[in-house]
Curated annotation (Swiss-Prot):
The lineage of its organism: Eukaryota, Metazoa, Chordata, Craniata, Vertebrata. Residues 329-339 have a biased composition (Pro residues). Keywords: Acetylation, Phosphoprotein. Residues 19-142 form the PX domain. This is HCLS1-binding protein 3. The modification N-acetylmethionine is found at M1.
Length: 395
């Protein structure tokens, strides 16, 4: 953060008892990348206090400078003042809004101006370390301004002795080299002088004639190279597999299993191979262990036992049902008899007219039809409907 430019001004300090005037005359919109940006409120500081002056200013000079702060920085400073000085009466902060417009920016600037004017009028707040840090001045003697009497602040410009105490708060002080532990200041000075003389003697050496001077290259101290420690195994390093020799060649297996062959076991999985030919069983050329081991294997009892051992039923049902008796099946109940369907009624057959029709039957039917009323017609329809319902339908 660059320090603000402190300029001499002809303005008069309005708050004579504090020697400090604060105001927020304007604001500035700072545009960022794309649609980002923020608003900075410019605080004008007019003061005659020595903590804000540099070495080129006189004690009676009045200086001014601008400090730009964002809303969040002013809010943080406001909360610090309230927590450290609860008895101070300050105007409230402007409200927070989601979308800030021009009217909100103007309202915030006016309220910030009112808050900082109240701070500059209060002698305790005007000399507080929180305010000095907020304005960009961090000095070891700034913390004592809050405890000073207001009359002392008024007479700072009239006392000529204060010019010795005035120093620049905006310039960095030179870093002091820390003393070497375990040595006094004289020993440290002697060691530094001795090192400088050795460097000069190494750099400039006269030739035998004394005419020319040449620079001798410095010898760098040899650093003993330490042996690198053995790398530690991590979870990603491959460890030596103790079972790696199980799947190697026959020669490696025989070499690794030589000590195991010395121990003779009484049991063998496979019989020794039959040499056959003219070699008899009691031949002295054979090993005694071979002749002994062939004895029990030639007996027929072992052959029968091996046959029984490897005889396995091929049918899985027989294997699963070994030793289990078949359960009797429960008797099923007889199904109830279904009654036979009723016989369908037959259609009434019309009697066939045999012989010629009577001559007087036609006019009689016409007279009967004419004599029928509504009830007779309804009865006729019902009779025919019952006949149609009694007839079986295929659908």
């Amino acid at each position: 953060m660059q320090s603000p430019a402190v300029l001499r001004t002809s303005r008069q300090v309005q708050n004579a008892h504090t020697g400090l005037d604060l105001s927020v005359p304007q604001h500035q919109e700072v545009r960022g990348k794309m649609m980002s940006g923020h608003v900075e409120y410019q605080i004008l500081v007019v003061t005659r206090l020595a903590v804000f002056k540099s070495a080129k200013h006189r004690p009676e000079d009045v200086v001014q400078f601008l400090v730009s702060k964002k809303y969040s920085e002013i809010e943080e400073f406001y909360q610090k003042l309230y927590s450290c000085y609860p008895a101070a009466s300050l105007p409230p902060l402007p409200r927070k809004v989601l979308f800030v417009g021009e009217s909100d920016i103007r309202e915030r600037r006016a309220m910030f101006d009112e808050i900082l004017r109240c701070v500059s009028k209060d002698a305790q707040l005007a000399g507080s370390p929180e305010l000095l840090e907020f304005l960009g001045t961090r000095a070891p003697g700034a913390t004592g301004l809050a405890t000073r009497d207001p009359s002392v602040l008024d007479d700072t410009a009239s006392q000529p002795g204060d010019s010795d105490e005035a120093f620049d708060f905006f310039e960095q002080q030179d870093e002091v080299q820390p003393p070497t532990l375990g040595l006094s200041s004289k020993d440290v000075e002697k060691s530094l002088v001795g090192e400088e003389e050795e460097e000069e003697e190494e750099e400039e050496v006269l030739d035998p004639l004394g005419i020319m001077r040449s620079k001798k290259p410095k010898k760098r101290p040899e650093v003993a190279v330490r042996p690198k420690p053995a790398p530690r195994l991590t979870i990603f390093d491959e460890e030596v597999d103790p079972d790696a020799g199980l799947f190697s060649s026959d020669k490696k297996v025989s070499e690794t299993r030589r000590p195991l062959e010395t121990t003779q076991d009484s049991l063998k999985l496979f019989d020794d191979p039959d040499l056959g030919g003219a070699v008899s069983l009691g031949d002295p050329l054979l090993l005694p262990a071979a002749s002994e081991s062939r004895g029990p294997t030639s007996r027929p009892e072992h052959g029968d036992a091996s046959k029984e051992l490897f005889r396995v039923e091929e049918d899985l049902d027989l294997i699963l049902n070994l030793g289990s008796e078949p359960k009797p099946k429960p008797q099923t109940k007889p199904k109830p008899l279904v009654p036979a369907k009723p016989a369908l009624p037959r259609k009434p057959t019309l009697p066939a007219s045999v012989g010629p029709s009577e001559p007087g039957s036609g006019p009689q039917k016409q007279q009967q039809i004419q004599a029928m009323d509504e009830m007779d017609i309804l009865q006729y329809i019902r009779d025919h409907d019952t006949l149609a319902q009694d007839s079986p339908s295929l659908f």
